[in-house]
Amino acid sequence: YSQALIRAETLVPGAGREAIEPLLSEASLSVTGADVQTDRVVLDGTAYCQAVYRQGEETTLRALTAQATLSQVIEVSGAAPGMLVRVNAQVEHVESKYENGHMVFLITCGLRAQVLQLRQTELIDAISGVEDIQTVYGELRSCKLAADTDADVLVKGEIALPVALDARTSLMDWGAATIESAEAELGGLRVKGKV
């Protein structure tokens, strides 16, 4: 487990001498690469940030976005090039503040990396010609990676908002995907879920 502090900033449009008051901030983290090296894993990714703020005495709210790159090394004793790696990255805390015409985001991320090594094992299924042998039985689980691929999908939909909200502008956008099932199909895999 490792923690990383990421700083992202963006110019606040139209900012002058008026006070800028951040009201709400949100961030998400995407890991785009994981390289296993000797006794460590190098992670690369991007942090995406959004904030809603008020400028001066205005009654309308404004929003902006920013992003920053992540490059973090996690020490993993026994790791070696060629091993498989699993990574879990999540945003633990995010805050935004206004500094000299810029909205600054400070994002605290929690990172976990697990390395796996494949090794060959021989199974003994019979012994003959020996008497009085003591045996111990154990359960062996074997997994074989049959295929590995990536796929992108565009999900589009609409939600009707009540008229009472008087929502004319989208201030912040975020979403999460949940996989409910994965079934093998001829030539591929059908994944079903919700956003």
Regions found by a protein language model. Name each.
Residues 1-194:
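Viral structural modules
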